[in-house]
């Protein structure tokens, strides 16, 4: 396995990221070492929350939330998934299976001897993290999830599978305009409808070798004016992103892990791994979902409520875990850790304190 490591100089002078790095070596199935990075702040004797990020973000996504946890003396740990942030980046598409990510993060959890945890996950952080919780339940006291879930669609019509396959193989790469229009159309629709919308994001990410992560996060995560975003997008389309003179801080931060396109295999390939159709993860998904049906520890569903990509997943999460509680929807879109940091932190902290 060829593994890439982002030079530390790429992370110098990042705004609001003064945190000491922690590294843990895990092992791939082939015996290769993969170094996983995490940040860890707050009192070791206090309650501990572990926050998993999604695609295409990294632990920087939680920088706005960290001060709220520290104020309440809650220890917060935020790892970077392999392929993201300061963690090592395997270079091949086949390295980024759903199962590999689960296995690597279980190793990370065990090697750091973490226990008495509150888990929080969003996007891929929830897909991976919920499977980790199901594998190591004794290490977790409670679970909070938002804008995520454990997708399980074993009975997708053949006509839908064929239409998706044809699109992925033969259609032109979608534009960001195509993606925007299709993703916003996912809200509260049937699984069939969502598959044929989400495929635009899957194809765009895979086809775009130099995925403009900074631009995407500045659009999805807020922090950029409409005119500035349009201008920024024009530079990206011309292949002149590095010459764009008004790059926002959020874009700089989320571009930092990727010195070149070779480092982006994880962010490109993982959307295709989302199990919205029957695939190799089907049995493991069912096993994890069955586990949460009998989960008897505190579980909180805390969705934004205005994220069209994941809105319909909240009902599924509540069905999957019958004893789960539902928090009020706070808005903020897909990456509400960035847009609603205080509101989301308050929900998690209140949930922890109610149970301690």
Where in this protein do the model-derived segments appear?
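Structural cue for short, hydrophobic secondary-structure segments
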Residues: 51-54, 78
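Typically the conserved alpha-helix immediately C-terminal to a functionally engaged Cys/Sec
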Residues: 64-67
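Catalytic histidine-centered segment of alpha/beta-hydrolase-like enzymes
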Residues: 332-341, 345
């Amino acid at each position: 396995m060829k593994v890439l490591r982002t030079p530390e100089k790429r992370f110098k002078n990042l705004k609001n990221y003064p945190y000491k790095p922690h590294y843990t070596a895990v092992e791939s199935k082939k015996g290769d070492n993969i170094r996983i990075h995490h940040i860890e702040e707050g009192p070791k004797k206090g309650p501990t929350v572990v926050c998993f990020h999604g695609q295409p973000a990294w632990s920087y996504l939680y920088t706005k939330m960290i001060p709220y946890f520290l104020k309440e003396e809650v220890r917060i740990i935020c790892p970077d998934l392999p392929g993201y942030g300061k963690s090592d980046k395997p270079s091949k598409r086949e390295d980024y299976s759903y199962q590999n990510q689960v296995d690597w993060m279980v190793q990370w959890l065990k090697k750091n001897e973490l226990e008495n945890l509150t888990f929080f996950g969003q996007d891929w952080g929830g897909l991976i993290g919920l499977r980790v919780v199901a594998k190591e339940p004794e290490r977790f006291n409670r679970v909070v999830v938002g804008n995520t879930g454990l997708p399980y669609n074993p009975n997708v019509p053949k006509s839908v599978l064929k239409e998706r396959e044809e699109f992925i193989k033969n259609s032109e790469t979608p534009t960001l305009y195509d993606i925007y229009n299709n993703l916003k159309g996912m809200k509260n629709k049937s699984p069939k409808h969502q598959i044929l919308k989400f495929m635009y994001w899957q194809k765009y990410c895979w086809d775009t070798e130099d995925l403009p992560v900074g631009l995407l996060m500045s659009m999805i995560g807020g922090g950029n004016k409409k005119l500035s975003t349009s201008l920024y997008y024009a530079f990206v389309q011309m292949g002149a992103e590095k010459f764009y003179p008004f790059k926002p801080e959020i874009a700089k931060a989320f571009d930092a892990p990727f010195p070149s396109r070779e480092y982006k295999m994880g962010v490109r390939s993982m959307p295709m791994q989302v199990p919205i159709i029957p695939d190799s993860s089907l049995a493991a998904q069912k096993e994890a979902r069955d586990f949460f049906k009998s989960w008897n520890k505190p579980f909180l569903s805390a969705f934004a409520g205005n994220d069209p990509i994941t809105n319909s997943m909240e009902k599924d999460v509540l069905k999957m875990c019958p004893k789960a509680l539902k928090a009020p929807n706070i808005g903020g879109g897909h990456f509400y850790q960035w847009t609603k940091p205080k509101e989301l932190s308050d929900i998690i902290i209140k949930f922890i304190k109610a149970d301690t």
